[in-house]
C-alpha cells in the first residue's frame, strides 16, 4: 500500500513537471509577442512662443505617423503668446492620438496660456506641488505690458472666454 501511494505521488509530480516544462517551452501567443504601445513624450518648458508651438505640432504629427498610443506633454510654463497658445490648442484638439498634458515636476506651473493648453488635452493632470491658473489675457505687444481701455479689455476677455468654453465643453469639462 505504501509503495503504491509512493508510485502515484511520483507519477503526479512527474506529470506536473512535464506539463510545466512543455508550457514554458511552447511558443508565445501573438498577444505576448506584440511590442509595447508607443508613448511619445514632449516637453513644454518655458514661455509659449512660435518655436514651441511648432515643436508641439511636429511632435503630434510624428506621433500620428508612428501610430503612437498616447502623447504625454510634460508642462512647466508661466504662459506666453496668445497666437502660439491657440496654435498648440488647435494641434492638440486635432490630434488623432490621445494627448495627456501633465504639469510637472514638483514646483512646476501651468499658468496663463499654459492653463488653457492644460484644459485642451484629452487628459489634464498635475503632479503634487504644482500650480495652474492666472489665465487672464494681457495686452503686451513686444512683451511690454500696456494699459488698455475697458471696452477693449472686455472684448479680449470675452473672446478668450468663448475660446475656453469651446474646447472645455468638447472635453466634457466644467466651464
Predicted features and spans:
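Hydrophobic alpha-helical context, especially transmembrane and signal-peptide helices
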Residues: 8-11, 37
Amino acid at each position: 500500500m505504501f509503495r503504491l501511494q509512493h508510485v502515484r505521488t511520483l507519477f503526479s509530480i512527474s506529470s506536473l513537471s512535464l506539463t510545466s516544462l512543455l508550457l514554458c517551452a511552447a511558443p508565445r501567443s501573438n498577444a505576448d509577442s506584440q511590442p509595447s504601445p508607443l508613448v511619445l513624450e514632449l516637453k513644454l518648458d518655458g514661455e509659449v512662443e512660435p518655436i514651441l508651438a511648432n515643436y508641439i505640432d511636429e511632435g503630434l504629427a510624428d506621433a500620428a505617423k508612428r501610430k503612437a498610443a498616447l502623447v504625454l506633454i510634460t508642462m512647466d510654463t508661466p504662459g506666453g503668446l496668445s497666437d502660439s497658445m491657440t496654435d498648440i490648442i488647435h494641434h492638440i484638439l486635432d490630434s488623432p492620438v490621445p494627448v495627456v498634458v501633465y504639469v510637472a515636476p514638483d514646483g512646476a506651473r501651468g499658468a496663463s496660456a499654459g492653463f488653457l493648453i492644460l484644459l485642451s488635452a484629452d487628459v489634464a493632470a498635475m503632479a503634487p506641488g504644482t500650480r495652474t491658473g492666472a489665465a487672464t489675457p494681457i495686452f503686451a505687444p513686444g512683451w511690454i505690458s500696456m494699459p488698455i481701455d475697458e471696452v477693449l479689455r472686455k472684448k479680449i476677455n470675452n473672446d478668450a472666454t468663448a475660446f475656453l468654453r469651446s474646447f472645455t465643453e468638447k472635453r466634457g469639462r466644467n466651464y
